[in-house]
């Protein structure tokens, strides 16, 4: 298709210009800002170095090394983001200490240039503290050391080194990483290619390099100060090395480079072939000067091509020169022509604005050397070409001159039929000029592998007495000396056989030679040095037979000679040799009587190694298994476990020790049991060994596989001694390996750990659940810094901490860390503790759970004593945290080091200056909040995170706004009403969230991944991401990323049910199969049938009633909301309405229900005879543990943890206060729902202490009542609808329904009802003090609302622990005392509601006085049918659900504003519909409801269809905004 006609379209041009402008704006907005002043050459160099990246120059700084520092800052940003904040930094520059966080910093003693840097270092924050400590000679501290990276042993998994390892070789770095137990290290190095050249001076447009015999000096272009000096050999090692092998393997990978500045990722793992080209874009060729400076006489001396000087030549110049010389005619080829052509192409040529030739400006000597090198190279190529052609022609002549039969014979004898090139006539040597006169680093490939430093110490320093890398044997994960075979020779008076082996330990104080230890291999030079050093007294030997089974030689027998009783021990620090008889085949036997051999135990007092069965026991598990410290190969057990590999080949570590001790066990054979990690082989030996390969955690963590391996191992008959399988080179956590072993360990089984792991096992594994508290040491310097922070606290917080001072102290704490949503705060017991939170939002959440929560400034001022809980400890400023804990006795901290740390809002740098170094005492890795996709995304930050959530995909990029809005900056918070920042959201949980990333948060998100972690881990179900500017794309939060995560997630299958599934009950005949109906149609029909009009008012506050008794406490302001907004099914409701949010409505309810005078009769009523009519066999009972368990289950179901239950003290308000809450009426009515003139309803909650005291008793009494009721009685809800339906269906014909509903039932109860309750409690055996306490609390009480209070007496409160029980009992007592029922068949009682199906009913004469004296208000009626507790009673027809009442109550509810309320509506309708349908009473229900209310059957069918529509989530909701009419007088 031809689109040329659109090329000149204005719209197309405009669109292209707009797109280009947008791209330019985006590039400039995201560009790297370059702040130093630069020369023109430096600017060009930076643009070329950062090719592909946008730079924006905003000069404002004067730097000595501007180009290098810009490169340094770029690589530093990448490295710190990759390493995270809790890393170890090697050789940190003083200016970076206050800006960046690190767990530890390693320095060398400041000398020379370092001394200058520390003298001019910043005089504030942590940098100033370290500067003063270094200059005062402090060697080691928590935050730093000046031992150097190679000598320090601070434990840290990740490290960084920014231009600080130019003096350490890769092998030494590998050993240092092992000492630090470091797995990953990011190393930034300056590695110029000129370091690979011989001594000389080399220049390019970026820098000048001067190579001396051992130094490499680099000075960058236009720099104003001295350059950099490095060791050439070290630079060459870093350039050529890609891996370190040996005991401390390391893999080196180049992950980023800017020019010759590299970021090397050093990983502690086995190296693999990784050939690489370090300078793939080098545009320089180095040409050799064949003359050579100061060489011997003669051009072709052997070293002329090795030590010659090289000149850098632009690649384009050299390629053009070689092309010209190669293509010249033989007659025209000469050196002068090459020199003339070289001079010509070295001249810059410009044609207009086009540079035709960039030019080159060489020196005279350089020009001559290049021309000569080119001439010699072309000469050599021409000679090779001539020789090749001549030999080829002779070969062709010979081939064509062959006879026929010779050709046939050659055809059958030659295997190859395709002729190749014959180059056998010439072979080049490396020292020849013909071997090449140029070095081209663009084509150089390096893949060198060296051995770690501790492996080569004996070869480099043969006189050294020991090795720096000495750790426990045999696991060797932290760096053990290389052990080699070295037979003992002459030099001692001992006659030891040649095949004995020695072991050297430089730190030992044992005998010079001791053969009582297992056979080990040793260092050659150290052994020789130890043997040459003669002790003052003959050494004593103890030779132990360690020969293989079946060795025919006699065991060595050492006869003890007469020696002096006091041998002189070797001086401490000298090497000590331990020798063990080897398994070699040759060598003379040791004679039975040797004068130089003396039993060690009889002569010396030196300590001996632990003997078999005498190892140190760390712990004994309940199963009888033991954890011991010792050598696995010497443990007395039936079976020894060898942590083998999958191929069962002799390896390193403990597996290698098994092979060296018992080589006859290989090849492995025996009983095999296959596992996914590899076959487990039971070998009979001797000794009996179980070869058990564990899972490789370097590939994938597999706790289940580890448990399976231990389970198979512990199936062996007899005791089993195991190591921590997979905890060595396979990198499994020691905790997981221990837990897997402990899960299946039996009585007598052993877990053998080495000495260096003992403390780790004791602290973090064996003491799980009772972690040893850590200590926070506050020295004088830290206390001064804390006091400085408190004194300079900004307004308005300075008034809170005014006068607070902190002295040096030590605080013991336990820090529970874990992944987001792991239940850190919900699992801690906050009873009696003060909770310190960083934000008010978090404090309110703690207060809602019943805790005493304060913010850090309040805590610093109050200094709480006793138990203190610190939530989100890492987010609290350290000086406030220290000040808050100065009086605390028991401190529990909660937090996550990967989330947002304490922020330095006011720029005082106190966060970095006061480094508390908090270390977790326990880690939790199971999240109960985060969905699966979020967990997978966070695996880089939390490698072992898992979740119990069932949500697979939760993060969406649809642009919708749902749930709580979370932003990153205060500006964005002001632009998005209702939103909160990530700092405020930290520690909170929401069902749905919306993350809004604005452009002003780019720097915050790019510099701190913790902010994104907090934002992504706040939701349970769904998270909508709105990222218009692509801010979150930089950290990988994209739709494509989460789509890939969703594809990777394995959807778990539902677990099989424990029992047999029961199908839903089959419905009986009577189903109408009515389809769902429109809810708005049902609402209109219901309004017409009942006669209710659409609402014009949300509620009416009637005039307040008169306070007849009690004392009322009123707030200063009686305000409330003037309008109500609800999302409802209709604008017409059928429930009595009130205004629960109005303060006047609350006071009206308090006074109307509990402020009226209570009538107290002058006569006493004995109602026990009345109770005997329905309650028989009242006698003493005791609540069992079942009632207490039911109480605990009820508390847990409501989210309570029992922390609100306190000691019984009536003077304590928490123990005696009754709390009042106003609630919606939601009472279905056929009268006017608004102008009803009645007060609202409320809930009175008793304190949890009294509920826990009386609750189990009342529950036991209730069970006794229900169990003893006569036939036909139905109590509360403790029956099934089917039983009630059957009883009503079987009622005799002609029976009537008597129903009664008390008015003001609670407020009319007085001393008569209370005395009755107390009398029943006494007869059931309740202690007298409890009865008296109940009578006291019920008689005189204080009802406390949020802002109001009422002090009164008598009455009944709905929140009492026995509300339903005693209200129902009082209801039954009054009805049986006032009325007499003839032939009752069904009697239902629940609270103040009651229904009796009987033949007739008449009033008792004695009941009139009870009603009058107690002021009872009874609303009774008798008819052919009645209503009871949302049920309609029709004698002879049965019991059906009240459809119209259910629909009317739904119209009053507010089903907004979130999706959760709509789901509640759907679930409620589903339950109601299922309740009707499963009983097969759909037709009966519709008919009886229509008959009860006197409406059309069709209308009830539409209501039934509307309920079905709501159950199917097909309802229609309307928003009603209505005013509240206030008729009360506020004065």
UniProtKB/Swiss-Prot annotation:
Record's catalysed reaction(s): RNA(n) + a ribonucleoside 5'-triphosphate = RNA(n+1) + diphosphate; GTP + S-adenosyl-L-methionine = N(7)-methyl-GTP + S-adenosyl-L-homocysteine
Main location: host cell
Residue ranges of coiled coil: none
Record-linked InterPro entries: (+)RNA_virus_helicase_core_dom, Alphavirus-like_MT_dom, DNA/RNA_pol_sf, Hepatitis-E_hinge, Hepeviridae_RdRp, Macro_dom, Macro_dom-like, Macro_X_NSP3-like
Gene3D superfamilies xref list: Leucine Aminopeptidase, subunit E, domain 1 (3.40.220.10), P-loop containing nucleotide triphosphate hydrolases (3.40.50.300)
Residue ranges constituting the (+)RNA virus helicase ATP-binding domain according to the UniProt record: 786-924
Renumbered residue ranges of the record's region X-domain: 622-786
UniProt region (Methyltransferase), positions on chain: 60-239
Residues in (+)RNA virus helicase C-terminal domain copies: 925-1058
UniProt PTM: ORF1 polyprotein does not seem to be processed into distinct enzymatic domains by a viral protease belonging to ORF1, but could be processed by a host serine protease like thrombin.
Residue ranges of domain RdRp catalytic in the record: 1295-1406
Molecular function as annotated in GO: ATP binding; cysteine-type peptidase activity; helicase activity; metal ion binding; mRNA methyltransferase activity; RNA binding; RNA-directed RNA polymerase activity
Subunit structure: The protease domain interacts with host EIF2AK4 (via C-terminus); this interaction inhibits dimerization of EIF2AK4 and prevents EIF2AK4-mediated phosphorylation of host EIF2A.
Family note: Belongs to the hepevirus non-structural polyprotein family.
UniProt note: domains: Contains a methyltransferase domain, a Y-domain, a putative protease region, a proline-rich disordered hypervariable region (HVR), a macro domain (also called X-domain), a helicase domain and an RNA-dependent RNA polymerase domain.
Protein name: Non-structural polyprotein pORF1
